[in-house]
Amino acid sequence: MWSILKAVRENPEILYESQRRRGLSVDIVDRAIELDRKWREELKRVNQLRKRRNELARAVKEAKGEERAKVIEEAKAVSEEVKRAEEELKRLEAELEEVLLSIPNIIHESVPVGKDDSENVPIKYWGKAKVYFEDVDAFVEMTQGMAEYEVTDVKPIGHADAVEIFGWADLERAAKVAGARFYYLLNDLVWLDFALTMYALDFLRKEDFTIVSPPYMMRREAYSGVTAFSDFEEVIYKVEDEDLYLIATSEHPIAAMHMREVLEERELPLLYAGVSPCFRKEAGAHGKDTKGIFRVHQFNKVEQFVFCLPEQSWEWHEKLIENVEKLWQGLGIPYRIVNICTGDLGIVAAKKYDLEAWMPAQAKYREMVSCSNCTDWQSYRLDIRFAEERGKPSKGFVHTLNSTAIATTRAITAIIENFQLEDGRVEIPRVLRKYLEPIESAPKDFIMPAKSQ
């Protein structure tokens, strides 16, 4: 049984508490409980009427004369009543389903309560951050003394300025061609983008993930199963006059990959590493990161995705963020792990971690990775179940999890700020060099300012 319906029937207090912690009204839970009660009562009534109809059908065969005419008349009346009751049952079922689908995922008990992203809770710091001497006090206050750091006398040029000053990207011409938040990556940054992708895929393949290049477009039916589409529609691009939408992340087509399937227990978990471009309108981001390549309409990303048994999902949530940490430790970029609070969580996830990289030019941590356990929120909508074997009764809905591995343009911004030298060169993380060495024209040790190439 779907966890939200199970809670409605067996333990509604879980839903009440989840809604309260999210800062949302509990009225939707009351409505679901009432509709479910009415639906079950109507189902009982329909079954009783069907039973009576069957009894009368048998009685018609045995009755004779005037008695038979009376039985036929009653049978017709009951049949009409069955029809009306079935229509009412269908109406109640549709209304109940609509209400249930509007209830956000049940929040895990470890999610901190908070109103917005300012109340997300850092739970771990890694690496020694390079902190400009004027930013030290703010850094110590921000990290509450939990993070290591080294003081620097020179503040790096911010990534947004660096990519243009050193000729690594052309945003002005991209704006002329496609509008704001687009870019042309040039030469060394193109190679770096490729190397980051190969690094993440190579790592995940060694962890037994199946590498997937998914469709870059999805139908509305599939998209509605992976996200709250009415809220998400303003974020994605629609193909005009087609029932197709450009994907915002490979998570979405991979989540829908097993739509309307029953998976065997023995084949779970299914581990996928998706690689794709991502297309986002960035609605609601007006005024945020308007320069550079940090917040853009199109970017490349490697994504982790897991289908697993319900009892495995919390273990896998920790494993996915562990994979991410290994990748970012390999890059040598200081970061922190943040437990996302209730007000910033969104309705799909039961719990989410973010990995935020230290950006020395901005003197702040910035989001690079989101890692979510969606439990059975997506699988119920997509009708992805599990059973002991195919053909045997379903035991329930699988759990789905997703996590960024590396979003390449964001990773590039972190590399530029953390490994920038005074002469403008940027040291390439050692773990990426083996993916560049076989290519004669690719940079090997440093990204060079264009004038020095």
Swiss-Prot record:
GO biological process: selenocysteine biosynthetic process; seryl-tRNA aminoacylation
Main location: cytoplasm
Top-level EC class as recorded in UniProt: ligase
Binding site for ATP: 280-282, 296, 367-370
Keywords: Aminoacyl-tRNA synthetase, ATP-binding, Cytoplasm, Ligase, Nucleotide-binding, Protein biosynthesis
Annotated compartments: Cytoplasm
Quaternary structure annotation from Swiss-Prot or TrEMBL: Homodimer. The tRNA molecule binds across the dimer.
Name under which the protein is recorded: Serine--tRNA ligase
Organism: Archaeoglobus fulgidus (strain ATCC 49558 / DSM 4304 / JCM 9628 / NBRC 100126 / VC-16)
Gene behind this protein: serS
